[in-house]
């Protein structure tokens, strides 16, 4: 059975990591000196936090990296018992081989409960001589200040377009698939700097066709073309509510798009609309209100239809 491409092409060391040059440079410095503080990696999903932690461990420990590295996903194991058992049991034992310390990687650590984070803080203090913690999170504000103050903080930004394109082209060549420019542009659009999403979309598209264009990508990603979203929005802004709503229903039924997906794509199109700055402000406010109501459980079609209606009377 073929491995997912995100695993098949995951970097094996820090030299292979795509993007984040400054962060990688600092991590290599830790490897060279065999010394590092506790680390906190923050950033949106798919930008390389887990990969950086794994590559750091492999470069630090070589063949014994699995014995000296513990990875836990805090969103699955988020309670205080995990800190008291798995984490503490691993932290209290000495490193294997000539490693100066062990590394515990807590992925999605912002999902840990407050009690678990306080227990973690005490564990970090107690075993700091033989163990280092690498915490990964999407929202650093959810990490308690005492933990943040004990860590060197690394902020991972969404990957640049050139980094995404370079990596996707290398994978395409190895898998003998042809990605047209329109297909590559579509992958960049739907992934929004998320390498994991970009590779997954590429693999899904390759399962449909060995010649990948924008039609294939938007279909497998369940996203509308930007020009279709723009067309719907402009119809609504010009007071053609019925036509705009028909376009909306087409997107939701034919493309299987969720209300949340459509809201995000409308929001991304706002800067490109030929309306005044004041109208853009009012439109963003209406989009925010619609998004809030959908998240709270309101009917998606009704809320999006109401948003299209408001567009026709923007001031």
Curated annotation (Swiss-Prot):
Q: Which GO terms describe its cellular component?
A: DNA replication factor C complex
Protein's job: Part of the RFC clamp loader complex which loads the PCNA sliding clamp onto DNA.
Name its species.
Answer: Methanococcus vannielii (strain ATCC 35089 / DSM 1224 / JCM 13029 / OCM 148 / SB)
> Entry's PANTHER family?
REPLICATION FACTOR C / DNA POLYMERASE III GAMMA-TAU SUBUNIT, REPLICATION FACTOR C SUBUNIT 4
SUPFAM superfamilies from the xrefs?
Answer: P-loop containing nucleoside triphosphate hydrolases, post-AAA+ oligomerization domain-like
**Can you state the subunit structure given in the record?**
Heteromultimer composed of small subunits (RfcS) and large subunits (RfcL).
Q: Output the Gene Ontology terms for molecular function.
A: ATP binding; ATP hydrolysis activity; DNA binding; DNA clamp loader activity
What residues bind ATP, as annotated? Answer: 43-50
UniProt lists the family membership as follows: Belongs to the activator 1 small subunits family. RfcS subfamily.
This protein is called what?
Replication factor C small subunit
Question: Which superkingdom?
Answer: Archaea
Per the UniProt record, one Pfam family is RCF1-5-like_lid
Q: Name one GO biological process term.
A: DNA-templated DNA replication
UniProt keyword terms in alphabetical order:
ATP-binding, DNA replication, Nucleotide-binding
InterPro entries found in the cross-reference section: AAA+_ATPase, ATPase_AAA_core, DNA_pol3_clamp-load_cplx_C, DNA_Rep/Repair_Clamp_Loader, P-loop_NTPase, Rep_factor-C_ssu_arc, Rep_factorC_C, RFC_lid
């Amino acid at each position: 059975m073929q491995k997912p491409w995100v695993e098949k092409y995951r970097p094996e060391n820090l030299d292979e990591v795509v993007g984040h040059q400054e962060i990688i440079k600092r991590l290599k410095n830790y490897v060279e000196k065999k010394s590092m503080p506790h680390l906190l990696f923050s950033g949106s999903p798919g930008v390389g936090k887990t990969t950086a932690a794994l590559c750091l461990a492999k470069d630090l420990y070589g063949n014994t990296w699995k014995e000296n590295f513990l990875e836990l996903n805090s969103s699955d194991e988020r309670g205080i018992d995990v800190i008291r058992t798995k984490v503490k049991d691993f932290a209290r034992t000495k490193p294997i081989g000539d490693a100066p310390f062990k590394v515990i990687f807590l992925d999605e650590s912002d999902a840990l409960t407050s009690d678990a984070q306080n227990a973690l803080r005490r564990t970090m203090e107690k075993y700091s001589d033989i163990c280092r913690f690498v915490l990964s999170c999407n929202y650093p504000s959810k990490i308690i200040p005492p933990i943040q103050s004990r860590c060197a903080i690394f902020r991972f930004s969404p990957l640049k377009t050139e980094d995404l394109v370079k990596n996707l082209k290398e994978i395409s060549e190895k898998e003998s698939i042809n990605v047209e420019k329109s297909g590559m542009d579509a992958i960049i659009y739907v992934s929004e700097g998320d390498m994991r999403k970009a590779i997954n979309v590429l693999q899904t598209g390759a399962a449909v066709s060995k010649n990948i264009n924008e039609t294939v990508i938007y279909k497998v990603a369940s996203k509308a073309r930007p020009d279709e979203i723009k067309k719907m929005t402009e119809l609504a802004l010009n007071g053609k509510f019925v036509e705009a709503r028909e376009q909306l229903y087409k997107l939701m039924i034919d493309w299987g798009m969720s209300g949340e997906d459509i809201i995000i794509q409308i929001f991304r199109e706002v800067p490109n609309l030929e309306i005044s700055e004041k109208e853009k402000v009012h439109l963003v406010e209406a989009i925010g209100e619609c998004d809030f109501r959908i998240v709270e459980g309101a009917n998606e079609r009704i809320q999006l239809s109401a948003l299209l209606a408001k567009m026709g009377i923007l001031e």
